[in-house]
Amino acid sequence: MPTTFQEIPRERPVTPLLDRADTPAGLRRLAEADLETLADELRQELLYTVGQTGGHFGAGLGVIELTIALHYVFDTPDDRLVWDVGHQAYPHKILTGRRNRMLSLRQKDGIAAFPRRSESEYDTFGVGHSSTSISAALGMAIAARLQNSARKSIAVIGDGALTAGMAFEALNHAQEVNADMLVILNDNDMSISRNVGGLSNYLAKILSSRTYASMREGSKKVLSRLPGAWEIARRTEEYAKGMLVPGTLFEELGWNYIGPIDGHDLPTMIATLRNMRDLKGPQFLHVVTKKGKGFAPAEIDPIGYHAITKLEPADKPAAPKKASGPKYSAVFGQWLCDMAAADNRLVGITPAMKEGSDLVDFSERYPERYFDVAIAEQHAVTLAAGMACEGSKPVVAIYSTFLQRAYDQLIHDVAVQNLDVLFAIDRAGLVGEDGPTHAGSYDLSYLRCIPGMLVMTPSDENELRKMLSTGHLYNGPAAVRYPRGTGPNAPISGDLQPLEIGKGVVRRQGEKVALLVFGVQLAEAMQVAEQINATVVDMRFVKPLDEALVLELAGSHELLVTIEENAIMGGAGAAVGEFLASQAVLKPLLHLGLPDIYVEHAKPAQMLAECGLDAAGIEASVKARMARLGL
């Protein structure tokens, strides 16, 4: 196996067994004695594939043996296999007829980064967000019962995803209806960032405790049929502790708990799954794996190797670096530390995205004011509300797509009470290769309808910093949404001064056409304006809208064009149209934004071009409307 990033194979490895097992039917024709060799080949294939395309890396390496065992024992796709999140699903894709398409992974018109029902009958449930698998598999199990079907339902969930309340809601309901289903806990002590909280510590005790306890009866029944396995388990103190601690938790929830077992021991896993396959009622198998298994750097640094970029050919000269500014996330991270130094009321909250949201420095400098609540978005928002009630100034750093999961808490717990909570909304707009499940396409629409909410859209790095200060000092709930990636390298002011609320800025004066920009498309709008001599306005605020400026522009221009990287329906452009209608102002409007579709995965630039939000697309749309109006 490779021991460095540079040693990842750049040519497809020789895989005689995998060549015969590119579907589960082919896999099940292999002798069980060949499966460990198959696992080695599949791991090499995964290293090669992700090296060519980039993508999620460590999670898939950790479930090679588990994936083989599941497809070997269960009759997929008739038996329903549901993966949680989907980071670990690449080996599943390779074994289910998509090996020859894996080099199109995460690319335009290629296969998706996550399981998709439209892509394969083996992808029984579309995922991307965490903690949904048990609910989905339970629904499938109940449907099978109603249809008098003997098909099995299996959910594979990581220990990180198990921290979310939704997972426990499903566990509780499954025992209530006595569903015939299997939940497999893939325990690698990781989600994306290292797990936190009581449950993670609870499970971690299986590897450290010296407490001895008798084995659970359910485990004994299964493992006693495995040659040698019961004797090994009997002698293993970690196993004994696992039966006492995690077993108690899940048994109390009404599940028959088995484990923990070694998730890289194929014979034991296959035998255990066979024994559990026909057991009635809710079954829970605890499997311990190592994220990044088989690639030493990923085993040592599972956070850093959660995902990787594609390898460039060894003989390819390095491309000259384009001048660009810092990442928007980095601008936020620096502002957070600066404001924390100036205001000791500030606290930072994240739902398991410390690295992605650039909170590492803050967490080290202000550990007592940093709170990683794990994958628990609803809790994160209401936690912030409680802190705000007592005079703290919480900043919730969260991806746009994940804030959707806490919408009720945002309204009921924060906005209705007019609490001082700032939402730093990262990954707004189109995010690229992860596709529609991770796109931040709707936040302007679902935020601007909330009474009292301050909603801001920065056009560059400096605007982001100023808006964060504005939101922090605002009396009430505030949101700043910013995209993935780097800015245009605007000079950044070091101060913490706020903006005047509800006031846009005219960046270029032109004639006839006014481009009203909400967000980072300002640079593209300026390019277009040079071609058609248009006025360009950085609107800054979606709510409150700069109504006086909108009226002024409507009175002095023949066409108003709104530009945003958000759904057109209900977005910032709709706010402009609604206001003009309320004032009985009839003015031609053109709304440019995300269409009423799910924009499929591709490079961000390709996605923007597809939506007409690059400079060429904006220019073409505006010129077409001008022609229709005779301008």
From Swiss-Prot:
Homodimer. SMART domains: Transket_pyr (SM00861). Keywords: Isoprene biosynthesis, Magnesium, Metal-binding, Thiamine biosynthesis, Thiamine pyrophosphate, Transferase. Thiamine diphosphate binds at H87, G128, H129, S130, G160, A161, N188, F295, E377. Belongs to the transketolase family. DXPS subfamily. GO terms for biological process: 1-deoxy-D-xylulose 5-phosphate biosynthetic process; isopentenyl diphosphate biosynthetic process, methylerythritol 4-phosphate pathway; terpenoid biosynthetic process; thiamine biosynthetic process. This is 1-deoxy-D-xylulose-5-phosphate synthase. It holds the Pfam family Transket_pyr. Its cofactor is Mg(2+); thiamine diphosphate. Mg(2+) binds at D159, N188. HAMAP family: DXP_synth. One of its GO terms (cellular component) is cytosol. It comes from the Bacteria. Its EC number is 2.2.1.7. GO terms for molecular function: 1-deoxy-D-xylulose-5-phosphate synthase activity; magnesium ion binding; thiamine pyrophosphate binding. It catalyses: D-glyceraldehyde 3-phosphate + pyruvate + H(+) = 1-deoxy-D-xylulose 5-phosphate + CO2. Catalyzes the acyloin condensation reaction between C atoms 2 and 3 of pyruvate and glyceraldehyde 3-phosphate to yield 1-deoxy-D-xylulose-5-phosphate (DXP). Pathway: Metabolic intermediate biosynthesis; 1-deoxy-D-xylulose 5-phosphate biosynthesis; 1-deoxy-D-xylulose 5-phosphate from D-glyceraldehyde 3-phosphate and pyruvate: step 1/1. Binds 1 Mg(2+) ion per subunit.
